Amino acid sequence: MPTNLELKARTDNQSIAAVLQRLKARDLGLVKQTDTYFVFRPGRLKLREMNSSRSELIWYQRPNSHHRRYSNFKRIPVKDPQSLKNILASSIGVKAVVKKKRRVYLFKNARIHIDAVENLGTFIEFEVMVTKGRVQAQDLLSFLRRAFNVKSRSILVTSYCDLINRLRKKPK
């Protein structure tokens, strides 16, 4: 099963573009994503619809932690996302819908995401693919955290889904 080492943080860092350029990170483009999270345990289950053309069902499991968030995941392509969404919504329920614009970069064996999430703000996320061992993944994540000056107070321990649900529950 594939594994990533992940870190997600709030950002308003104006120097992100300069850091990406200095690292020579490869720009893979902008993707509009709608993630529909379903009521599911263990782990999380979401249907990701991208740029109105590609979709995939993703299951993942990871701890809510500041440090060493390893995520085990499985994903499959989906040809008819609307039908699958209707079936899952009817059978197990929808937990939240997260809409975002994601700029994706690649640096070594890490994906760097700059996410503009509807109603939440801007975030940076590192997904280090654990393909060269855990020590290398931890070292690369630490390097990226320093390079982008990610402070501990800005690190998120939950998913966008949890943040959206908290926002919905706040009294107006």
Where are the language model's segments positioned?
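Mixed-charge, glycine-accented linear interaction segment located at domain edges/termini
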Residues: 132-157
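Glyoxalase I/VOC metalloenzyme domain signal
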Residues: 2, 17-19, 123-124, 135-144
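Conserved, surface-exposed functional patches that form binding/active-site neighborhoods
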Residues: 96-132
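N-terminal strand-loop-strand beta-hairpin
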Residues: 1-109, 148-172
